[in-house]
């Protein structure tokens, strides 16, 4: 089981963590949402939960709850710039379909 991140994603997360000044790492999870069923959740972690699993990659701790790991195993977190837009992109090999707007997915 693994979660990885690109160099650009690691640099961006580290910059956010440094600006924030505290935190253990970044939580990656899923929630029920959108027309395809699930959406990604990214948030800072200050306290660990009992079922959390930690993946450290490029100096960044990515923290995932046990229930989300089933949907996220093998995912690479990337940070991309396209024109004036920039943001995190999830390269998830488990995704079977995505909604037209790209906000949600199904496995």
From Swiss-Prot:
Q: Which InterPro entries does this chain map to? A: Fe-S_cluster_asmbl/transfer, FeS_biogenesis, FeS_cluster_insertion, FeS_cluster_insertion_CS, HesB-like_dom_sf, IscA_proteobacteria
- Can you supply one Gene Ontology CC term for this chain's record? cytosol
One Gene Ontology biological process? iron-sulfur cluster assembly
Q: Which cofactor does it need?
A: Fe cation
- Alphabetical UniProt keywords: Iron, Metal-binding
Coiled coil residues, start to end: none
User: Which molecular function term from Gene Ontology is one that the record holds?
Assistant: iron ion binding
**UniProt-listed Pfam families:** Fe-S_biosyn
Keyword Metal-binding present in the record's keywords: the answer is yes
Cofactor: binding details: Binds 2 iron ions per dimer. The dimer may bind additional iron ions.
Q: Has keyword Glycosyltransferase?
A: no
Instruction: Tell me which residues bind Fe cation.
Output: 35, 99, 101
Query: What top-level branch of life does the organism fall under?
Result: Bacteria
Instruction: Describe the family membership recorded for this protein in Swiss-Prot or TrEMBL.
Output: Belongs to the HesB/IscA family.
Q: What does this protein do?
A: Is able to transfer iron-sulfur clusters to apo-ferredoxin. Multiple cycles of [2Fe2S] cluster formation and transfer are observed, suggesting that IscA acts catalytically. Recruits intracellular free iron so as to provide iron for the assembly of transient iron-sulfur cluster in IscU in the presence of IscS, L-cysteine and the thioredoxin reductase system TrxA/TrxB.
Oligomer and partners? Homodimer; may form tetramers and higher multimers.
Q: What is this protein called?
A: Iron-binding protein IscA
């Amino acid at each position: 089981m693994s979660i990885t991140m690109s160099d650009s994603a690691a640099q961006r997360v580290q910059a956010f963590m440094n600006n924030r000044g505290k935190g253990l790492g970044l939580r990656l999870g899923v929630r029920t949402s959108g027309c395809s069923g699930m959406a990604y959740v990214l948030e800072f972690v200050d306290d660990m939960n009992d079922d959390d699993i930690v993946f450290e990659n490029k100096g960044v701790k990515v923290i995932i709850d046990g229930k989300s790991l089933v949907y996220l195993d093998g995912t690479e977190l990337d940070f991309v710039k396209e024109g004036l837009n920039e943001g995190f992109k999830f390269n998830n090999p488990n995704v079977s379909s995505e909604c037209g707007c790209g906000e949600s997915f199904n496995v």
